[in-house]
Amino acid sequence: MNTSVDKILSQTAEVDQASVQPFTGSQKIYVQGSRNDIRVPMREISLDDTPTDFGGEKNPPVRVYDTSGPYTDPEVAIDLRAGLPDIRSAWIEERGDTEILSDSQSIFTRERLDDPKLAHLRFNLTRKARRAKPGMNVSQMHYAKKGIITPEMEYIAIRENMALAQVRELGVLNQQHPGMSFGANIPGEITPEFVRSEVARGRAIIPANINHVELEPMIIGRNFLVKINGNIGNSALGSSIEEEVEKLTWGARWGADTVMDLSTGKNIHETREWIIRNSHVPIGTVPIYQALEKVNGIAENLTWEIFRDTLIEQAEQGVDYFTIHAGVLLRYVPLTAKRVTGIVSRGGSIMAKWCLAHHRENFLYTHFEEICEIMKAYDVSFSLGDGLRPGSIADANDAAQFGELETLGELTEIAWKHDVQTMIEGPGHVPMHMIKENMDKQLEVCKEAPFYTLGPLTTDIAPGYDHITSGIGAAMIGWYGCAMLCYVTPKEHLGLPNKKDVKEGIITYKIAAHAADLAKGHPGAQLRDNALSKARFEFRWEDQFNLGLDPDTARAYHDETLPKESAKVAHFCSMCGPKFCSMKITQEVRDYAAQQGVNVEGISEDQLVKMIDVEAEMQEKAREFIEQGAELYHKV
């Protein structure tokens, strides 16, 4: 860790300017809820009018789901040292079931706060942590089971229903192919009551720690839009606090719905505080990583007491969900012996080593109900880790993987007994024809708790391109019912990702998630596709760029060969040129049909050609031949 950089950060930290630039052609808008403090952000993309050559009409703006937070709102002054605006404190306080702690309940937190050498690293947080009052449960699942619709639930309903509301207004763009949802219960409209019922049933979670008041609420569940997670975090080999905050804001800009801080290097506690205070998206962690650092990396020295203190430490900071590898049981470890790649999960290998060293059952499993007590006191959601996931397609769907999954199903029911929100982590490396079995088995044994998968990677032959090998599997499992997809960057298996890698991974997974929404037939999912297709046909180049997931790259690729501004109104691109543009030719066919008195509305191009008066066309060609001298051949 570079101390001089950290000193600068704690005194004069500044946000990455690339992360706070509004998207070209877009503006941040807010939709008001039933109360003044429910303001749901969306990104509205302005569109040009259709050119007169194509009928000349107004194109209404298109609203899209926005994960970029206050960072792209020009009205919000971003100051990393102060953190993001408080959204949820009033909602939490009015429920009357929490108390403010006079001091941290974590021994480790108190030690860090008492260490003067860390002063230059600390985020200047004046607010004290909250916890449930004795005997109280503050989870969104607990409220949902009691029939309470929280402000978080209303916020989410507005956010998820955004495209549905707009579709009804846009006429020609509202056509959508029926999907195949594989038994998902996707309604025609997302209401606050539907959100409540899905959370109560355990089919969806709202990761929203009561100490993460900067959070813009979101939901993870198979009957909602497919979400994606981006990973950040330092390591022993490098990266500063400043770089991790930068990766957070950058990932959220491009579409990360949640972010996991997987730091394993120095100053994990301080790094996480900076991240959470400047994050509007849910933050997840793997607490066993930090617990391992506390015992100098020696897995055998881990204890329940150290792990418990780590959970409290992170819950007080505001971590929204914990990956906990409680399903790695002693009896499953021998099942991995003949695998090609053994145990590839860091958390899984840590717990397997502990189990073998002590020849005792996993303490995360034996203390699971005590963990639930901590989770419900702060509303931290479980992400039950797949510590025995396959690390190669050769090991996919084996006894170790599915044995652990069965145990995760048992633990899910225990968590639900405590009203603790729970999702299940999944593989991994799985060839395409074996992916659906994973989804079907998870739905069965985990009673439809949300599934959250890393990919899966569909082949192992493409280091450097694993964002693509996994994006294929992610799109498929998202279609089958997976609720959240954990991104993979081009650096997977090779190194720590930088900003460029983070963006590439996020965009790849946004494509996969959206493709899954289309395949499921999620209402309103096709609106953006239709708007972009219409812009493409009408050669509205700027609208094409702005409607895309990555306007910057689309614009740059176009400008490599046609850099002049005049090219952005041309009726062709560099792929086919002016004479061979299929869309230009199609429009000419339509124009000709109109001249012949053929109504082209709703007619396919093949039908259109057949309906043109062939005899009239032949006569026209005969006239041209005679006027040109009736010569059989002409010099060229």
UniProtKB/Swiss-Prot annotation:
Please state the Enzyme Commission number of this protein.
Answer: 4.1.99.17
According to UniProt, the reaction catalysed is: 5-amino-1-(5-phospho-beta-D-ribosyl)imidazole + S-adenosyl-L-methionine = 4-amino-2-methyl-5-(phosphooxymethyl)pyrimidine + CO + 5'-deoxyadenosine + formate + L-methionine + 3 H(+)
Q: Which GO terms describe its biological process?
A: thiamine biosynthetic process; thiamine diphosphate biosynthetic process
Q: Which UniProt keywords apply?
A: 4Fe-4S, Iron, Iron-sulfur, Lyase, Metal-binding, S-adenosyl-L-methionine, Thiamine biosynthesis, Zinc
Q: Which GO terms describe its molecular function?
A: 4 iron, 4 sulfur cluster binding; carbon-carbon lyase activity; zinc ion binding
Q: How does it assemble?
A: Homodimer.
Q: Which HAMAP family match?
A: ThiC (MF_00089)
What protein does this entry describe?
Phosphomethylpyrimidine synthase
